[in-house]
Amino acid sequence: MTDNLNLGAIDLGTDDEFIARHIGPRAADTQAMLQRLGYDSLDTLIGNVIPDSIKGSSVLDLPAGMGEAEALASLKAIAARNRALRSFIGQGYYNCHTPAPILRNLLENPAWYTAYTPYQPEISQGRLEALLNFQTLVSDLSGLPIANASMLDEATAAAEAMTFCKRLSKNRTSQAFFASRHCHPQTLDVLRTRAEPLGIEVVVGDESTIEDFSAYFGALLQYPTCDGEIVDYRELVSRFHAVDALVAVAADLLALTLLTPPGEFGADVAIGSAQRFGVPLGFGGPHAAYFATRDAFKRDMPGRLVGVSIDRHGKPAYRLAMQTREQHIRREKATSNICTAQVLLANIASMFAVYHGPQGLLRIARRTHRLTAILAAGLERLGVAVEQKHFFDTLSLATGARTAAIHAKARAAGINLREIDAGRLGLSLDETVRQTDVETLWGLLAEEGQALPDFAALAASSGDRLPVELLRQSAILSHPIFNRHHSETELMRYLRKLADKDLALDRTMIPLGSCTMKLNAASEMIPVTWAEFGNLHPFAPAEQSEGYRQLTDELEAMLCSATGYDAVSLQPNAGSQGEYAGLLAIRAYHQSRGDSQRDICLIPSSAHGTNPATASMVGMRVVVVACDARGNVDVEDLRNKASEHKERLAALMITYPSTHGVFEEAIREICAIVHDCGGQVYIDGANMNAMVGLCAPGKFGGDVSHLNLHKTFCIPHGGGGPGVGPIGVRAHLAPFLPGHARGERKEGAVSAAPYGSASILPITWMYIRMMGGEGLKRASEMAILNANYIAHRLEEHYPVLYAGGNGLVAHECILDLRPLKDSSGISVDDVAKRLMDFGFHAPTMSFPVAGTLMIEPTESESKAELDRFCDAMIRIREEIRAVERGELDKEDNPLKNAPHTAAELLGEWNHAYSREQAAYPLASLVEAKYWPPVGRVDNVYGDRNLTCSCPPIEAYSEE
């Protein structure tokens, strides 16, 4: 008889299984870190960090965590409630195929989706090249020389085009913008939202009936129209130009492979969506939009722009160009608050074009159009009135009294058609359509008993339905990069080559302050590519999206619990758009009370640049509030300015914990001062990762906050987007949350789709569900512990600029490098570049204080990784001391010359320090070394010699 092995007490549950996977430090590490800080427990540390005035404000009431497998099964059951019917709705959203090598090697690859915005170009060359490919794709197809690195969605891009035209039009007397009624309805809705606070009148009408062109400073046209017609806009554009108005054209990128591009018929701006280049429908997003314009207007273009420069060795290198245009620099003078792009989605579109090449894209476009032409010919034989003479992929049909019955019949057959009105319906085809789909559509639209057309006969007899005078004559995608990677092997290796050039979370900690580069767990990411979430059209009938409704309802409740607010909107598809929606809600609230004069927004001097930029966009005037020597809001200055502007005070925008990395003791008093003067308090949720489960902004004075789901709640940054920026509000602001034409409240849309970037919301649902209430609280506590551990280890080498009353920081700390500039000539930029030689992404540079580094380790980094970073920073300080002592030359030293490339080390070595010191300053680097692909990039050269499309092939051959 065999004795039973006694394993002792075993926990049979999996409630906290994921928490230990998400949080980096082990229990023993946590105790060691606490001991170093002089605390006996995590509770004691947190008790000394959180101000007494807000302790107990948390209302986090969530169930216990759930194991990974259990959470995935639970979410799968929710997803199963969605019914992804075959969609022919169109209206800017189309079925497409995501090529398998792009799905596996890019979209599902953490080397791509965990990277940050490429502000440090030397360690971002891979995704910068991919984005340059995207810009070249857009520039080629639009016929305009300058394209940016993507926008949030087509409707947002259209709104940016409107304000762009307002700034640049020489028609200074007009406040009216013409928008064709043939534009997508969701675009028109966002235009109206964005125009009203700026005093712009959006006139929606038929462009063929315009009598006084001088009444408008600009216009937006759709090409082809939403209903499918291909219109010759050449004369119309000329008439607008004759009165100094600018013209923006919303154009379908796939159609532009066959049609004359907007730039060739005079458009000043082209905007649109790249969704159909390999990105799933996703119930509306995320998708990459595009924005292209003339060279003369490049400095006024919104969004990010990738350009070509050189490194210090004269080698071509990519970088973000003309960054002085961006809102974080221009602040209240900014003309846009866009501070991100849809990089991951733009890179998918970029690689879709690289993989298919010009001939592949033309095949897709021609096949899509031919099938549409055959469909139209068959419908006409069946007696159905096709309203378009010329079209690309979309038809509108006059179906009269039969319309409702046809829709019902289609849905019973698993098909969605576009609902235009009671007597008309629409059909949009795409790259996934085949002969059987066309025959099925004939069957749905035929009268009972009618014989269906013969497909083969119609295919042979029907011609194209593109207007001859608008056929494209110019070549597309002639650059070699679009003509060499057409086999899966070649594309796979190209993607690997690019990924190897970059630093992302799959290689190293990214300690960027105010960015919260935490773990994006694999189990959170898996549902993103489920067909149940990816294949649903955002305008499908409501009964087909019950799974999404359950997901969003549950997620809104979770976020209310985390923040203490009463209502949440998930529509904003970036933090900047959440800010905008929050200030719009405040503005609308004041107007509803007859307080339209309230237009003053108080903003601390330490605020992120989006805050003043957003305030300006909603028509508010910014008044800056001073900060004291410890980095806190100067309460007396706030009191004086709130009192001075009492009758006009609309809002205070404040980040909490502060952008200086401190929990300000006076936050309740600050909120009360503003409320007493009739204002509302907007608490920027960028730093929510320090608060979840510990304190709740909705309970200590906030009226509204936006949350960065791509920070606190684990949606990956994707190399610079996507993001989600939902807003939470107190009950009195709930009626003023963003609306949508397909929702109960019709006005106030800030995104094209009702739920913005809906298909990545499962990431946050999974994170919250697996962590549970206790896990979320522990994440906040560990983020604070990790930040204080780094601050404590480094404070004897670099001054920690700000701390709270107990000498502790929140979830991030700021190191002051300004004294080093005076003593050694070493700048913050030199330290940032030197960190690359150690295999690290630099912390946030010179924000919120010039000459500093802001470090945010997050809860996901282990003690070993924190120590590795601290060891690197300490070794760098030793190198600076060597410069101070004269042991290293002030100009020829490892910091001034950083980063060092492999090619440099293999070449002739003329430096006063060794190759080993340059490349292997720590012994640990011998085991695993990251090599920056280029040396330090010359920013000035890049802006003076601006090139924003793919460089000639010779540049690639030099690699």
From Swiss-Prot:
The modification N6-(pyridoxal phosphate)lysine is found at K711. It is an enzyme of class 1 (oxidoreductase). SUPFAM superfamilies: PLP-dependent transferases. It catalyses: N(6)-[(R)-lipoyl]-L-lysyl-[glycine-cleavage complex H protein] + glycine + H(+) = N(6)-[(R)-S(8)-aminomethyldihydrolipoyl]-L-lysyl-[glycine-cleavage complex H protein] + CO2. Its cofactor is pyridoxal 5'-phosphate. InterPro entries: GcvP, GDC-P_C, GDC-P_N, GDC_P, PyrdxlP-dep_Trfase, PyrdxlP-dep_Trfase_major, PyrdxlP-dep_Trfase_small. Keywords: Oxidoreductase, Pyridoxal phosphate. GO terms for molecular function: glycine binding; glycine dehydrogenase (decarboxylating) activity; pyridoxal phosphate binding. GO terms for biological process: glycine decarboxylation via glycine cleavage system. One of its GO terms (cellular component) is glycine cleavage complex. The keyword Oxidoreductase applies. HAMAP family: GcvP (MF_00711). The glycine cleavage system is composed of four proteins: P, T, L and H. Belongs to the GcvP family. This is Glycine dehydrogenase (decarboxylating) 1.
